[in-house]
Amino acid sequence: MKTSMQRKLDQLSTRLAELNDLLSRENVTADLDQYRKLTREHAELGPVVEQYALWRQSRSDETAAQELLGDLSMRDFAEDEIRSARESMSRLETELQKMLLPKDPNDERNIFLEIRAGTGGDESALFAGDLLRMYLRFAERQRWQVEMMSESASDLGGYKEVIVRIAGQGAYSRLKFESGGHRVQRVPATETQGRIHTSACTVAVMPEADEIGEVEINPADLRIDTFRASGAGGQHINKTDSAVRVTHIPTGIVVECQDDRSQHKNKDRALKVLAARIKDKQYHEQHAKEAATRKSLIGSGDRSERIRTYNFPQGRMTDHRINLTLYRLEALMDGDLDELISALVSEHQAELLASLGDAD
């Protein structure tokens, strides 16, 4: 283990001991905000220090076994112990490296998931509906809460555009790698010749701002229009101007919400989505220079990048960023995404580890 890493772990061990002392004091709950901050830090450091203690125990076991090598009657036993201790240290060091990776500050946030139909007309809109169902089934498996924010249905079913809010522990950390272009290859229901068509949708995963005030929005920069909500085919579904369109003039970002009968609620939802879109835009602009110097295949979140192909005739899904192909498309479309997401997270961690190695 590198000296710098060991020094960092020693510091964390000392800090955990300090936290144990602070949390054992009688007046610890006098300041609830401070108490929550301390318990959160304790929960983060505990597993790291525990792993480090196991690594130190393995190192101690190796040292003890080294001392037995001079005894011929104990040599075989000592060599086995040394081998076992080194394997354990190597495994624990890898785990510790992952645990020490820089945390994405957005990882524990709720998200807005936006799906837009792209090339392919009605078939693309139908696929947008299939993608939405896939993500909703995955959210259901995680026991996350889902709220429809905005939808623009197509005439034959599916969506031209749909935005949902997904709330739950680690929502952004699990779904942030879904941003990008999703391509589908299949025979559409309307196809009489049995030909395979290719269509595409774009997915954007945006972390929710804790408060709208977290993103600076000058009311003077907003244009707010109201209009009658309409369903598929353009028919008006109520007689009041309850639908709201909010335009952020400096960025040109436009958000429409018409799902609720209350104009006030639609405006509130639109402002929340707008705040998330502005925050997302700022985040990508901030990381543009970094992406230019070190191309990250996984975490770029580039909307124009084709990240995945869903081939229905072959029953396969291919993620082009990590060259992973899974031949169980039906289960994946039903929200069984754990294997795919875990592979993306692991690859992203490997990229981060490699970049830290380059920095050393």
From Swiss-Prot:
Q: Which UniProt keywords apply?
A: Cytoplasm, Methylation, Protein biosynthesis
> Where is this protein localized, as stated in its record?
Cytoplasm
Annotated GO CC locations:
cytoplasm
Pfam families attached here? Answer: PCRF, RF-1
Q: Positions modified as N5-methylglutamine? A: 235
Q: Give the molecular function GO annotations.
A: translation release factor activity, codon specific
Known post-translational modifications?
Methylated by PrmC. Methylation increases the termination efficiency of RF1.
What Gene3D superfamilies does UniProt report for this protein, alphabetically? 3.30.160.20, 3.30.70.1660, 6.10.140.1950
Lineage: superkingdom: Bacteria
Q: Enumerate the SMART domains for this protein.
A: PCRF
The yes or no answer to whether the keyword Amino-acid biosynthesis is present is no
Give the similarity note: Belongs to the prokaryotic/mitochondrial release factor family.
What does the UniProt record say this protein does?
Peptide chain release factor 1 directs the termination of translation in response to the peptide chain termination codons UAG and UAA.
Name recorded for this polypeptide? Peptide chain release factor 1
Q: Which organism is it from?
A: Burkholderia lata (strain ATCC 17760 / DSM 23089 / LMG 22485 / NCIMB 9086 / R18194 / 383)
